[in-house]
Amino acid sequence: ILFSGDTVARRLLYGLTGCPPLSLFCNDLQRLQQLPIRNIYSAHDRAALPPDYPSYMSRMLQTKLSAAAETWQYPGFPLMRRLVTGDEASPDYFDAAVPDARFQEENTHAI
């Protein structure tokens, strides 16, 4: 069993304070797949997440975030790029928000 706190969760608010680059975070999510995890309990989900959810998160962040057109802004937060996939009642639901400036900067350095 993995108690993941805010790191592996269906709702991810990423990159506001002291976080590694998104690419490193995705690599670390993939590394979790090497562990014998049967269930994942996050700080915010009411049910266990499947053991392959970290890989799913990584795949969504690496392949879908760049195409996400939705942005989100809340007082005191920077402009966030938001990705929402799946229906909230389904196991494949994922809602991620990443500071748009940070995302743009990482993509510029990757080119």
Regions found by a protein language model. Give the residues of each.
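Accessory terminal helices/loops
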Residues: 30-39, 43-111
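Catalytic core of the metallo-beta-lactamase
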Residues: 1-31
